[in-house]
Regions:
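N-terminal signal-anchor module of multipass membrane proteins
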Residues: 1-67, 78-91
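Short, non-helical or kinked segments that cap or interrupt transmembrane helices
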Residues: 64-77, 125-133, 189-194, 294-303, ...
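Membrane-embedded helical hairpins/re-entrant loop segments and their flanking transmembrane helices
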Residues: 31-62, 243-315, 436
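Membrane-embedded alpha-helical modules
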Residues: 94-210, 322, 327-435
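Hydrophobic, membrane-embedded alpha-helices of multi-pass small-molecule transporters
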Residues: 9-23, 162-174, 191-192, 206-207, ...
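Membrane helical hairpin/interfacial module
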Residues: 56-121
Length: 437
């Protein structure tokens, strides 16, 4: 009995660190993009931990019922980056841009809830072919790599001069995380990201790059603010963008469950049920993200790799870790320490994880033979989506809001384009030798 308690405790700690490592970096990156103050970043991190903990618990308890960690979605970050840059160029209040994003999260959440509860999600599965999924992951990695490299150089907001010392430390951490994830053994490989973040923060502190701004009035417990960015705003552009973006969120959930199925056995009859529950629960998670003004959270496919490496497949310790993260989020003094994480270090750690995403993208693309048809679709998709990324945000300034949000997002355009081409240009049916005779 005592051994079981020790094992459960260690398993809970491992899951807690995994949840924390995947939730801690993106709020720092978003804070840099929107030029948020330390207090704003700290409260954003608090709300992110709170939503990640609750969302992961709900998914494991009522949703797909697998130990799959929820975390801030990299795909949502692309939307945040685009609106943040547009607001900066147009001289708009960036808080208004964040209120529009709250509205987008609500729309996406409602659509996901309807798709999951009505079973309509099953009818959309034919759209998410290996070519579409691979293209989505590849474009996602490319689009966010630019944002993360800028963060590593210290180029956030209106800053035009790179911080040389920050860049040197960041690229060292980037290389270290990759090295540890490949060459590290046991727990070292499992926590390469966390080790990199810890060492990078220590180096920044040693070179005087971290300035603590704690106050004596920090309360012991504090519930996260509701609508901290203000009342959600809706316009036609964000509504249409969110409707299209839902396809990406469904694709993410399907990818996560498929990856975990390779680690945790599942009966075929349970697969559809798990998907529908995961989708409508994901809708609730997005509405919670809007309510608490944070980044949309999604099931993380990386959970499968963590489970395979550590052997942590039981749902009990996972649910306990989710509850622990939720409780930690109510303690501002703890969150303030985590908010001191330098943005360049967070960007470096995230960029290292995207190396694996590129590999997964290629694996998905190679699930089917890359014949002339698929190569052409892939080429068109990549050229158009990447070409849009190279255009300056000012190009889209004169467009109506609907077209502005869509056309300026290479990830969204590329994924929808791949879906359309896959359905319009049907693959030729192979005729066997006996059929010819």
């Amino acid at each position: 009995m005592e051994n079981k308690r020790v094992t459960d405790s260690l398993s809970t700690v491992q899951w807690f660190i995994f949840l924390l490592a995947n939730a801690v970096a993106l709020p720092i990156v978003i804070g840099g993009i929107f030029q948020l103050s330390f207090e704003q970043i700290s409260t954003l991190m608090q709300r992110t931990f709170f939503v990640v903990g609750i969302s992961s618990f709900i998914q494991g308890w009522l949703g797909h019922k697998y130990p799959i960690a929820d975390g801030p979605a990299g795909s949502w970050v692309s939307i945040f980056v685009i609106l943040g840059n547009l607001a900066l160029i147009q001289g708009q209040d960036q808080m208004y841009a964040l209120q529009i994003l709250e509205g987008g999260l609500i729309v996406a959440g409602l659509v996901l809830f309807v798709l999951g509860t009505t079973g309509l999600v099953y009818r959309l599965q034919f759209l998410f072919t290996p070519l579409v999924s691979g293209s989505f992951l590849f474009i996602l990695a490319l689009q966010l790599s630019g944002v993360l490299v800028k963060g590593m150089l210290g180029l956030q907001g209106t800053s035009a001069e790179p911080d040389v010392m920050a860049a040197l430390i960041s690229f060292f951490i980037f290389g270290l995380v990759i090295f540890l994830s490949i060459k590290g053994r046991g727990w070292i490989s499992s926590y390469a990201v966390l080790i990199g973040i810890g060492l990078g923060s220590a180096l920044f502190a040693a070179f005087g790059k971290v300035e603590p701004t704690f106050t004596d009035s920090t309360p012991v417990l504090k519930f996260p603010h509701i609508f901290a960015w203000g009342v959600p705003q809706f316009d036609l552009g964000i509504v249409i963008t969110s409707l299209l973006f839902t396809f990406l969120l469904v694709s993410n959930t399907i990818s996560s469950i498929s990856a975990v199925k390779q680690v945790v056995p599942v009966l075929p009859k349970d697969e559809k049920t798990a998907l529908s529950r995961g989708i409508w629960t994901g809708g609730i998670s997005h509405i919670l993200a809007a309510l608490f003004s944070t980044i949309g959270v999604v099931p993380l496919p990386a959970s499968a790799g963590f489970m395979k490496l550590t052997g942590q497949k039981r749902i009990g310790p996972f649910l306990m870790a989710c509850m622990l993260l939720t409780v930690i989020a109510l303690m501002p003094s703890v969150v303030n320490v985590l908010a001191l994480l330098p943005a360049p270090v967070a960007s470096a750690a995230l960029l290292a994880t995207f190396v694996q995403i590129v590999g997964i993208a290629f694996q998905s693309l190679l699930q089917e033979q890359l014949d002339h048809r698929r190569l052409t679709i892939l080429g068109i998709t990549l050229l158009v989506s990447i070409g849009l990324m190279f255009l300056p945000p000012a190009v889209f300034q004169s467009l109506p809001s609907t077209l502005r949000y869509i056309c300026s997002n290479g990830l969204l355009v590329g994924t929808i384009l791949a879906m359309l081409l896959e359905q319009i240009w049907k693959a030729e049916k192979k005729i066997s030798h006996y059929q010819k005779l």
